[in-house]
């Protein structure tokens, strides 16, 4: 008995030590993102400005409002006019640059708070996180309460999948009753949206849709192969993810434009449905196959170290081996990417609402930087600059009611804004590295944004990231 008590004491002592080490690790990691915290005495806490000498690209119409003034009051666009007279306000001279709505990335996977800075430095002032974990609820709370400077943050709950789709990243549902319980739980805990994933059969899928409607939660859907593709055109499902899913499911990898057209037509008739192509993440498969040293590239230094050590490495090895076993795989991947571009073109021509999403945070798809690659792909698919910019602004904001305050420069809207040196309606690349970012009216200059980049580069938070993921597994599984 004494030996048992002694063993129990040792076990509890070890557990206590491990918990203490974990808490210290997370505490130390929090210092790395201290620059995101809002100090009420710091200039970045100010969220009221009068912007002068600025050319406004409102994005509610294809135009430029030349030489305007824009009054931001407590994080809201209060007034846009030729002349505004306000006393006691800080004036920001835009020097005849261009003011656009902040960009919205509608498909991301956030792994730490350093990534929030990477999004801001690239002009992304709102994100839709599509793999919810407890840490995302804490980020969301801090954003809402104004504790940190961050993109406006929306998140789904954990990915809902069927029983046979095994993996620690999936929440496997075994019955309609369990599906309803999870939706109710996600709503109560503060998740914004529901994400359905691969492997949901009809009964469970129906249960999720029914309960989501009752709970007033929009659904974002990575199509399930257990139901017809057209099944995802349900009014409760506000966006469908990935152009590649059209290839994999209804087309069964047959890259046939005639067969594609009927699928495009069915999507276009579903006026409540937005489509998020995520061209970049699939193209990055091709990039991995073409560059054997991609994991050592300068850009990957911005990737979360846990993801770089696990998912990035795993994906690279998968496609490296596929190329080695069958060299023609490279050509097939490139051909499918080109077909994805055709899908984007056809979706646009059919009047489908396209929303910009990158799938950043997995593989080698970088947070923040990747949105400019995604937008360039849409341009190459045949969209005009205005139509491209719509995908990351007004189209995104109309997809979910909870995002309606974003996406355009209008009086009463949230002051998530970019100041860029050139007109993006003529030069799309002008959106890269904006000179100034306003997020809920708070101003970040280029020097501050570059500092956020540097803090994220080569960060040493692998253990802290692993602990947060462990928390997710304990809480959600």
Give the positions of each predicted feature.
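Structural recognition of alpha->loop->beta junctions
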Residues: 190, 231-253, 374-387
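Acidic, glycine-enriched loop/beta-strand segments at the rims
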Residues: 38-42, 56-69, 366, 384-389, ...
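Divalent-metal coordination cores built from histidine and acidic residues
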Residues: 94, 99, 116-225, 239-243, ...
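Acidic/histidine-rich helix-loop elements
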Residues: 160-176, 246-255, 324-332
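Histidine-rich, glycine-flanked metal-binding segment
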Residues: 29-48, 56, 60-100
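Active-site neighborhoods of metal-dependent hydrolases
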Residues: 191-193, 252-377, 473-477
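Metallo-beta-lactamase
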Residues: 101-109
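N-terminal Sec-pathway targeting helices
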Residues: 1-19
């Amino acid at each position: 008995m004494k030996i048992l008590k002694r063993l129990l004491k040792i076990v509890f002592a070890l557990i206590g030590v491990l918990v203490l080490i974990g808490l210290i690790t997370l505490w130390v990691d929090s210092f790395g993102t201290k620059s995101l915290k809002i100090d009420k005495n710091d200039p970045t806490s100010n969220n009221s400005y009068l912007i002068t000498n600025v050319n406004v690209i409102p994005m509610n119409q294809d135009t430029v409002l030349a030489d305007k003034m824009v009054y931001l009051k407590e994080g809201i666009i209060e007034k846009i006019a030729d002349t505004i007279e306000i006393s006691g306000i800080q004036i920001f001279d835009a020097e005849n640059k261009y003011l656009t709505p902040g960009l919205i990335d509608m498909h991301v996977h956030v792994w730490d708070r350093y990534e929030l800075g990477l999004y801001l430095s690239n002009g992304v002032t709102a994100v839709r996180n599509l793999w919810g974990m407890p840490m995302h609820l804490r980020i969301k709370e801090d954003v809402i309460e104004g504790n940190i400077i961050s993109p406006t943050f929306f998140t789904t709950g954990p990915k809902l999948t069927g029983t046979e789709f095994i993996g620690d990243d999936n929440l496997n549902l075994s019955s309609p009753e369990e599906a309803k319980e999870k939706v109710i739980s996600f709503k109560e805990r503060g998740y914004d949206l529901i994400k359905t994933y691969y492997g949901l059969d009809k009964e469970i899928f129906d249960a999720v849709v029914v309960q989501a409607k009752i709970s007033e939660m929009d659904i974002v859907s990575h199509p399930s192969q257990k139901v017809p593709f057209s099944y995802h055109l349900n009014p409760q499902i506000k966006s469908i993810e990935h152009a590649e899913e059209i290839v994999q499911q209804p087309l069964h990898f047959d890259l046939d434009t005639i067969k594609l057209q009927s699928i495009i037509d069915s999507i276009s008739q579903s006026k409540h449905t937005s489509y998020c192509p995520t061209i970049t993440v699939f193209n990055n498969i091709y990039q991995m196959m073409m560059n054997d040293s991609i994991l050592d590239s300068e850009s990957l230094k911005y990737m979360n170290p846990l993801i770089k050590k696990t998912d990035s490495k795993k994906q690279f090895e998968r496609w490296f081996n596929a190329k080695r076993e069958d060299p023609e795989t490279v050509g097939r991947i490139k051909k499918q990417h080109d077909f994805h571009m055709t899908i984007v073109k056809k979706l646009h021509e059919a009047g489908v609402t396209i929303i910009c999403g990158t799938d950043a945070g997995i593989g080698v798809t970088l947070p923040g930087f990747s949105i400019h690659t995604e937008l360039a792909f849409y341009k190459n698919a045949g969209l005009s600059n205005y139509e491209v910019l719509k995908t990351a602004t007004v189209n995104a904001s109309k997809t979910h009611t909870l995002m309606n305050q974003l996406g355009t420069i209008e009086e009463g809207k949230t002051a998530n804004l970019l100041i860029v040196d050139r007109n993006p309606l003529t030069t799309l690349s002008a959106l890269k590295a904006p000179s100034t970012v306003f997020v809920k009216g708070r101003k970040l200059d280029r020097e501050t944004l570059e500092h956020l980049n540097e803090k994220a580069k080569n960060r040493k938070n692998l253990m802290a990231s692993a602990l947060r993921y462990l928390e997710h597994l304990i809480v959600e599984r």
